[in-house]
């Protein structure tokens, strides 16, 4: 019998047991709440089986881990346990995918809670760690654990994209169809035979999304696949380029870090067109070539500025962060420090001016919009309470941001980072730049229309990522292991897990919409349009679902350039009264034979998700339409609402 010793293995198992216990307690509470709401009888066979599985499965996983810790890995390997444990891990992994992403046995609702999903991933993840460890006893267990959980996160990310690749003619999300339509507007004459306004929201996004429209008769599912490729590809490209800038990484660690970067940027749902600005910046950056780096900073500012005005300023700041870390000069004296700051400000201002110039060239020069309209869009109301937990964002912007970046900043102030070795003046500059981007991101996040996730915190998330990755002492980090006595092993491990946690949070059943599933509603919409337009001489107005016209599902319909969904909500949030009065006049004069709208918002008072936006939308758009078009048909599956009048 092998001697029982409390080695470093035991410390790992204690940690696994402790975390599993927390997940189990929190998950079980949620399960009991669901069971109570569902009025499930505790004597029913399904509920009885579920209760047993719920307690037996995680406890079994924990007992396995504890047993392995006591017995010792060499003995297990000799006994031939590595093959059974690999089989068990594989079976449970497949079982978890079925439970998390389908409703095959009717139990998926019990795993809709974050803690229940986390418990499954935690238990099966550690089984996979031990299974891999048995095949190579010399491999660093800490590294294996990091690889396994990052792989889980990437898997969840990819599976989560599957429902987006649908051939359904209807929009898959509130604004998805609008962005497809806006991309098509770049080829307006060829597709619609009329001149349409250039899309203005995020110009480079529309330009990139329009690429499939270069070819005729490309189905909508391919356009959606292209969006997924752009999203995953931009994040992957950023990961590849950043890791190439970090020397002396082993191949497996370089791949893992690249994938972790992908997960990190997806925490904030950083849009791919923003990421491509960052990719451009870091691709051209060279530590010993300022001129080349500066040119690419200018290009990144131009690209970023064409998306959002704050991203005209962000690339120069990101460039300075990396440059300061790579060039830790000692700047002594007020005069020298003032000159140093002046040079940074001058270079940054040049980049920002180029970015803003590109924005206005597109917005005013090509798009034909006015500067006054731009100012109106910038002066929208702020909803500060969304910084805190609310119905729009359960975590709140502040708490979610802290969870996302806190461990990066903790590690930056340890011996594993070169940050603490920088001269005081440069440390002050780095902290100031990150603080500036944090405050700027907060200002953008609280603007009405935002605050539902962290996508408007993108500048601060990227600055934290740059500061963290380029400051780390990678020789020390690569030697971290559970055998070491360093207290930093825990925050480093949690840091690797946090992006995976966001992927677990986003898990939901995979439902793929199809043409066949939506055909009935499409037929109703087409027949209604034909009937009303035959009776009335005026054209229909598609505020929502314009992509139906784009791909020919609704034919013989004139496209109205004005009053598109995203444009209209932007004007409502900016309280652009002249624009909204013109809309109201056109509706009151029955300029259109019918109006196709999104689902009419109900119960949108304070305490409801996006209450301010829904209130403005209802008052400025829906109520105006409903008061003048007295008949209404609601397509129940998609929520598409058709307002019309019978013509005499």
Write out the residue ranges for each language-model feature:
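Membrane-interface junctions at the ends of membrane-embedded or membrane-associated helices
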Residues: 1-6, 66-79, 131-138, 243-249, ...
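Transmembrane alpha-helical segments
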Residues: 267, 471, 484-518
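Start-transfer (signal-anchor) and selected internal transmembrane alpha helices
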Residues: 1-21, 51-160
């Amino acid at each position: 019998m092998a001697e029982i010793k409390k080695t470093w293995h035991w410390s790992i198992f204690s940690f696994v047991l402790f975390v599993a216990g927390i997940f189990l307690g929190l998950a079980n509470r949620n399960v009991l709440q669901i069971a109570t709401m569902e009025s499930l009888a505790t004597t029913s066979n399904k509920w009885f089986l579920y209760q047993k599985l719920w307690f037996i499965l995680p406890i079994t996983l924990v007992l396995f881990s504890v047993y392995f810790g006591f017995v010792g890995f060499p003995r297990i390997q000799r006994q031939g346990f590595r093959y059974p444990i690999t089989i068990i891990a594989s079976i449970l992994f497949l079982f978890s995918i079925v439970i998390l992403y389908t409703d095959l046995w009717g139990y998926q609702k019990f795993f809709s809670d974050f803690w229940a999903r986390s418990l499954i991933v935690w238990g099966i993840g550690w089984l996979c760690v031990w299974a891999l460890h048995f095949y190579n006893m010399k491999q660093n267990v800490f590294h294996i654990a990091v690889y396994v959980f990052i792989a889980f996160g990437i898997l969840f990310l990819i599976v989560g994209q599957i429902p987006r690749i649908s051939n359904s003619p209807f929009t898959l999300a509130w604004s998805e169809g609008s962005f497809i339509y806006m991309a098509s507007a770049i080829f307006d004459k060829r597709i619609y035979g009329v001149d349409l306004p250039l899309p203005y929201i995020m110009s480079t996004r529309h330009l990139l999304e329009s690429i499939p429209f270069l070819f005729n008769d490309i189905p909508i599912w391919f356009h959606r696949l292209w969006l997924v490729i752009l999203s995953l590809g931009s994040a992957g490209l950023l990961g590849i380029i950043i890791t190439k800038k970090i020397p002396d990484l082993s191949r497996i660690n370089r791949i893992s870090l690249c994938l972790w970067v992908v997960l990190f940027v997806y925490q904030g749902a950083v849009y791919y067109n923003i990421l491509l600005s960052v990719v451009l910046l870091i691709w051209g950056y060279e530590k010993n070539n300022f001129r080349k780096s500066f040119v690419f900073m200018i290009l990144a500012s131009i690209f970023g500025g064409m998306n959002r005005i704050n991203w005209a300023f962000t690339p120069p700041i990101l460039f300075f962060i990396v440059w300061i870390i790579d060039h830790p000069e000692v700047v002594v004296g007020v005069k020298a420090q003032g000159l140093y700051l002046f040079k940074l400000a001058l270079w940054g201002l040049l980049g920002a001016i180029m970015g803003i110039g590109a924005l206005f060239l597109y917005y005013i020069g090509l798009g034909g919009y006015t500067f006054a309209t731009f100012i109106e869009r910038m002066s929208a109301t702020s909803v500060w309470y969304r910084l805190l937990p609310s119905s729009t964002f359960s975590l709140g912007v502040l708490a979610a941001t802290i969870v996302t970046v806190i461990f990066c900043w903790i590690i930056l102030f340890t011996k594993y980072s070169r940050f603490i070795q920088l001269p005081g003046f440069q440390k002050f500059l780095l902290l100031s730049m990150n603080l500036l981007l944090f405050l700027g991101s907060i200002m953008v996040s609280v603007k009405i229309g935002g605050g539902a996730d962290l996508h408007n915190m993108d500048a601060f998330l990227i600055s934290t990522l740059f500061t963290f990755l380029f400051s780390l002492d990678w020789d020390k980090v690569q030697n971290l292991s559970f055998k070491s006595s360093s207290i930093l092993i825990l925050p480093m491990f949690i840091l690797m897990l946090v992006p995976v946690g966001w992927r677990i949070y986003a898990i939901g059943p995979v439902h793929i919409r199809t043409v066949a599933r939506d055909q009935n509603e499409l037929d109703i919409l087409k027949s209604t349009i034909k009937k009303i337009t035959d009776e009335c001489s005026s054209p229909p107005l598609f505020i929502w679902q314009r992509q139906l016209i784009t791909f020919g599902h609704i034919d013989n319909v004139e496209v109205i350039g004005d009053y598109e969904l995203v444009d209209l909500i932007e004007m409502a949030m900016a309280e652009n009264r002249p624009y909204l009065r013109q809309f109201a006049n056109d509706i009151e004069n029955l300029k259109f034979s019918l109006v196709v709208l999104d689902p009419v918002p109900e119960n949108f008072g304070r305490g409801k998700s996006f209450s301010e936006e829904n209130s403005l939308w209802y008052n400025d758009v829906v109520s105006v339409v409903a008061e003048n078009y007295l008949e209404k048909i609601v397509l129940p599956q998609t929520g598409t609402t058709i307002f019309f009048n019978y013509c005499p």
